[in-house]
Each structure stands twice: as C-alpha cells, then as structure tokens.
Amino acid sequence: MSGIISVMTQSLILSIMALGVYITYKILDFPDMSADGSYTMGASIVAFSLTNGISPVVATLMAILCGCTAGLVTGILHIKFKISNLLSGILVMGMLYSINLRIMGKSNIPLFSFKHLFNGEISPIVLALAFVFICKILLDLFLKTGLGYTLKGVGDNSQMIKSLGINIGSIKILGLMISNGLIALSGSLMAQFLGFSDVNMGIGTLVLGIASIIIGITLFKKFTFIKDTTAIIVGSFIYQFTIYFAMSLGMLSTDLKLITAIVIIAFLATGNLNISLKKTNAKLVPKINQKKEVL
C-alpha cells in the first residue's frame, strides 16, 4: 500500500513537470530540450539551499526562479541570437549540467537529515496534491487571459499574431520561462520527496512529460469539457502506474526507456488509427448514399 501511495505522490509531482512541458511542446510547438536540465536545476538549488540552512519554502521559490532564468536563456538564444529552437535547448541543457554540478559541488547530495517540505506534519501526498491543484488552477486562469490567448496564438499561427503588431519573441520567451519554472518546481519537490538530489535525475524528463501529455490528451480528446491540464495530470498517473506494474512483473529498471517508447507508440498509433477510420468512414458514407439513391 505504501508503494502505491509513493507512486501516486510521485505522479502528482511529475504532473507539474508535464504541465510545464505542455506549454512548450503543445502550445508553443517548441522542442525545448533544456527541460532535463531545468528539472535537475530545481533539485540542485533545493539541495544547496537546504544544506546551507535556508528555509524549504524559500529554497523552493529560488528553484522556480532559477528555472525561469533557464527558460529565459533558451529564449534569448533562439530569439535574439537566431539559434534554432532545438539547438538552443540542447545548448542550455549542456550548460545546465555543468552549472548543476557546480551548484551541488558533487554528483549526489542526501537530504534526509535536513528539514524540508515533505518531512513535516503534512502528509506528502496531500502536499503534492495541493501543489498540483495550485499550478493547474493558475495555469488555467493564465491561459484564459489575453496574454494566454496570445501565447496559444503564437503556437498556432505566429504570422497572424505578428501582423497584429505583437512581439512574438517576447511571448515565446515568456512561455519558456513559465514552462521551465514549472519543471524546476517539480524537480525541487521530487528531490525533497525522495530525500536526495542527483545530477543525473533529470535524464528522460522531457520524454516522460511528452508521454504524459500524449496519453492524457489521446484518452480525453473526445471529452471537450475536460481541460488539457486535467488530462495531462491523469496521463501522468497512467504512465507512472504502467511503469510501476511493469516493474512489479519483474522488468528491470534498465527497461524503463523501452517501456516508455512502447507506451507512447501504443497511444499514438491508437489515436492515428481512429483518425484514419473516421476519414475512411467519411468517404464511404456519401458513396453508400449514392448507391441507395440509384437503387
């Protein structure tokens, strides 16, 4: 039972990261490879702060701020220096690896003996749920504002937004900052929940986030009343429990990437198959009606 609760808590924390990836991957259509580094940066900042006697709350806020800064750098490289979006993310990811290692001073820092958010009186799963709820509500509210609609517009049709006299570069940078801030928040919470920070803990973060997005949106795309943010949170749960049950059946931790790839392929293939069937049916219906009229 404790194992399931632990997986649920981790799913909640990782869903915050998935919400951050959603902004760049789904809204901005920006392949931000720096997500792995931003996630680890959140953990690194918290580890450094806690070991130096800084409050867990302040440490978590610092992690968010540093994540936003990472997004800002990615945006500047792409917008101001005209470096491609993919390469900008890769460059920042590489820089963050060295920066995170420099921040921590070593590759791994245990946090069990330090006071942090998850070893207080509040239950870890309740605290994680509170963070997810706040992030989801704030993101939903933001996306309903004029700035939020502009952010969506930049991803859908940047030329139209540009024709309105809006600086699309600034909007992209803002989106990257929010995205990486959420990802760093997730990393900081995960480090506190697990009780350690590791320089390699962010590897695969982007893939995990994309998997949660694909699973959630594929499952709930027919239900228009369900928001994407809700679908992504559920997708994160489904993905994490898929991994959990696969590990319970005896699969090795080295098989995680294989499992992830299979899960993503399965949901993508299912979604594409449904689209193909709809198109085929749409073509067949008029022909059937014509035959009936002839008869």
Swiss-Prot record:
| Gene Ontology CC annotations of this record | plasma membrane
Matching CDD domains: TM_PBP1_branched-chain-AA_like
Q: How does it assemble?
A: The complex is probably composed of two ATP-binding proteins (CDR20291_0806), two transmembrane proteins (CDR20291_0807) and a solute-binding protein (CDR20291_0805).
- Tell me the protein's name: Tyrosine transport system permease protein
GO function terms (MF aspect) = transmembrane transporter activity
The root-end lineage is:
Bacteria, Bacillati, Bacillota, Clostridia, Peptostreptococcales
According to its UniProt entry, what is the function of this protein? Answer: Probably part of an ABC transporter complex involved in tyrosine uptake. May also import phenylalanine. Probably responsible for the translocation of the substrate across the membrane.
Give me the segments passing through the membrane. 3-23, 57-77, 81-101, 122-142, 173-193, 200-220, 232-252, 256-276
* Broad class of where this protein is predominantly found: membrane
Does the keyword Transmembrane helix belong to this entry?
yes
Q: What family is reported?
A: Belongs to the binding-protein-dependent transport system permease family.
UniProt KW keywords: Amino-acid transport, Cell membrane, Membrane, Transmembrane, Transmembrane helix, Transport
Membrane topology, as annotated, equals:
Multi-pass membrane protein
Compartments, record wording: Cell membrane
GO aspect biological process, one term:
amino acid transport
- What's the superkingdom here? Bacteria
